[in-house]
């Protein structure tokens, strides 16, 4: 089931509360942490999503988890509201939507850089600087390795992909040879 539209509404509401109270970064971190806890534990999901378990028991469990994690009242109340409305399964998407809103608010773009092998920190810093200059936004870089690229780098920012991999160049070269 897709929770994207529900998650957008909850994400927007949490974002606005965070902006109004000056706690946006903390709320985003807490919602992300709550999402990670929910996603990581199948047992927790089974208990929290089970309609046969009394609502009071589920809420008690959420209060205890929120207390142990030192979540703010806003985060704890959000989790309780999601539980009452049977929408806890939307929590990972809510966290994602909230992170997108925070990035947009702070003019941050997330770049995924994929290379065949490891890249030095210096190279990633230079790449980040060039991407920031090209986009006019602050860039957060995540590096991944994919040996199938052979050599080169593939960079993805939002929906834009810059493919400088040897695999793509060889594939393009092969296609050109076959056409002639």
Curated annotation (Swiss-Prot):
Subcellular location: Cell inner membrane
GO cellular component: plasma membrane; proton-transporting ATP synthase complex
Classification via Pfam families: OSCP (PF00213)
GO molecular function, one term: proton-transporting ATP synthase activity, rotational mechanism
Superkingdom: Bacteria
UniProt keyword terms in alphabetical order: ATP synthesis, Cell inner membrane, Cell membrane, CF(1), Hydrogen ion transport, Ion transport, Membrane, Transport
Keyword Nucleotidyltransferase (UniProt): no
Listed InterPro entries: ATP_synth_OSCP/delta_N_sf, ATPase_OSCP/dsu
Membrane topology field: Peripheral membrane protein
Record's keyword annotation contains Ion transport: yes
Record function comment: F(1)F(0) ATP synthase produces ATP from ADP in the presence of a proton or sodium gradient. F-type ATPases consist of two structural domains, F(1) containing the extramembraneous catalytic core and F(0) containing the membrane proton channel, linked together by a central stalk and a peripheral stalk. During catalysis, ATP synthesis in the catalytic domain of F(1) is coupled via a rotary mechanism of the central stalk subunits to proton translocation.
Family classification: Belongs to the ATPase delta chain family.
Summary of subunit composition and partner proteins: F-type ATPases have 2 components, F(1) - the catalytic core - and F(0) - the membrane proton channel. F(1) has five subunits: alpha(3), beta(3), gamma(1), delta(1), epsilon(1). F(0) has three main subunits: a(1), b(2) and c(10-14). The alpha and beta chains form an alternating ring which encloses part of the gamma chain. F(1) is attached to F(0) by a central stalk formed by the gamma and epsilon chains, while a peripheral stalk is formed by the delta and b chains.
HAMAP family in UniProt: ATP_synth_delta_bact
Protein name: ATP synthase subunit delta
Naturally occurring in which organism (per UniProt): Sorangium cellulosum (strain So ce56)
Gene field: atpH
């Amino acid at each position: 089931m897709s929770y994207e539209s529900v998650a957008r509404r909850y994400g927007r509401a949490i974002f606005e509360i965070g902006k109004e109270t000056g706690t946006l970064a903390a709320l985003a971190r807490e919602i992300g942490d709550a999402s990670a806890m929910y996603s990581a534990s199948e047992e927790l999901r089974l208990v929290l999503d089970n309609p046969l378990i009394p609502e009071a028991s589920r809420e008690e469990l959420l209060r205890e988890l929120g207390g142990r994690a030192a979540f703010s009242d806003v985060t704890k109340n959000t989790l309780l509201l999601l539980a009452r409305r049977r929408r806890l399964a939307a929590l990972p998407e809510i966290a994602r939507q909230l992170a997108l809103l925070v990035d947009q608010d702070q003019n941050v773009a997330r770049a995924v850089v994929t290379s065949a092998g490891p890249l030095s920190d210096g190279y990633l810093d230079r790449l980040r600087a060039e991407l920031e200059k090209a986009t006019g936004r602050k860039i957060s870089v995540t590096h991944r390795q994919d040996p199938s690229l052979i050599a080169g780098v593939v960079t993805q920012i939002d929906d834009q992909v810059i493919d400088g991999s040897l695999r793509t160049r060889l594939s393009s070269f092969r296609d050109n040879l076959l056409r002639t």
